Curated annotation (Swiss-Prot):
Gene3D superfamilies: 2.30.30.30, Nucleic acid-binding proteins. One of its GO terms (biological process) is peptide biosynthetic process. It comes from Streptococcus pneumoniae serotype 4 (strain ATCC BAA-334 / TIGR4). Pfam families: EFP, EFP_N, Elong-fact-P_C. Pathway: Protein biosynthesis; polypeptide chain elongation. Keywords: Cytoplasm, Elongation factor, Protein biosynthesis. The gene is efp. This is Elongation factor P. SMART domains: EFP (SM01185), Elong-fact-P_C (SM00841). It is found in: Cytoplasm.
Amino acid sequence: MIEASKLKAGMTFETADGKLIRVLEASHHKPGKGNTIMRMKLRDVRTGSTFDTSYRPEEKFEQAIIETVPAQYLYKMDDTAYFMNTETYDQYEIPVVNVENELLYILENSDVKIQFYGTEVIGVTVPTTVELTVAETQPSIKGATVTGSGKPATMETGLVVNVPDFIEAGQKLVINTAEGTYVSRA
């Protein structure tokens, strides 16, 4: 069992009614009067729906045991993403709604880790940084420096990242997948 105060982004737990929930955001909130509460943005792993809720810090949940296996992203068709276990060559279908954020960081044939809850595939873990090519951005401004506020750039996967002014379309960039931010040129 894990207390609500110990839940952090990325953790998965099971509710009393059997729902498998992943924490997207968690923060302590101390109202002017009364006790501290935990405000959380959560995702139902099975349905993909997200919702905001709050818990008392002492509330307890059953922490889900999640196993991961190495895999490769194959392709996306309609509302399904296809992955292959690189050890057993088994293929898995995951609804896009469950991995839509992760798909912004990976290209076909990218290495990932598939997450299992028992025998049920529940998600995908992407590397901490990935290399993506800039598909579209505003033209560079002569004399632009790194200290500027930056500009939006659309990557080849559709991800929009704020980049320095000197970045141009066609350049490969290193992107932090946890924050969705520019790290450096590749």
